[in-house]
Amino acid sequence: MIKSFSMSGQRRDLNREKFKLDNLLSVLISPESNANKNLKCLRNAMDVRSELQQFHPCSEMKCLSKGRSDIVVIKRSKGPESVFAIHNMTENKINYQLNDNDLPKIIDNELNAQDLLTSTKYNWKNISLDPFQVIWLSAL
């Protein structure tokens, strides 16, 4: 790495790992590798996102977590069709209660929301997030 830095003079080359194609492919296709698991999660997220009109670039977007450093909550779209992207930004498990003007119109049972990424069901008033977890909630 230092050799490529000294040749190019570009700081970005200092810590850039050089991959061998065969090694990289074997890691990516190995079901137990973190790279494979991460790639599957990213593919799933992109597939889900491509199907949701709420994630259209022109769709309304609002940050509901202003002033917080532990969680980011982004509301996409308006009304009962809204999707709430909730990101735990910490290495700790946290609990969160979602409050938004559109919620009273759609809360009607205990498990009233679903994560579009995993199909896990939640209650708007008691959302538990693992460290660095991301969920995309919509009403059931």
Task: Name every feature range the model reports, one short phrase each.
Residues F19, Y96-L98, Y122, I127:
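Generic detection of short hydrophobic beta-strand segments and adjacent strand-loop junctions
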Residues R68-S69, I86, L103, P131:
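Low-complexity, intrinsically disordered short peptide segments enriched in small/polar/basic residues
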Residues I74, A85-H87, Y122-S128:
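Short amphipathic beta-strand/extended segments with alternating polar/hydrophobic composition
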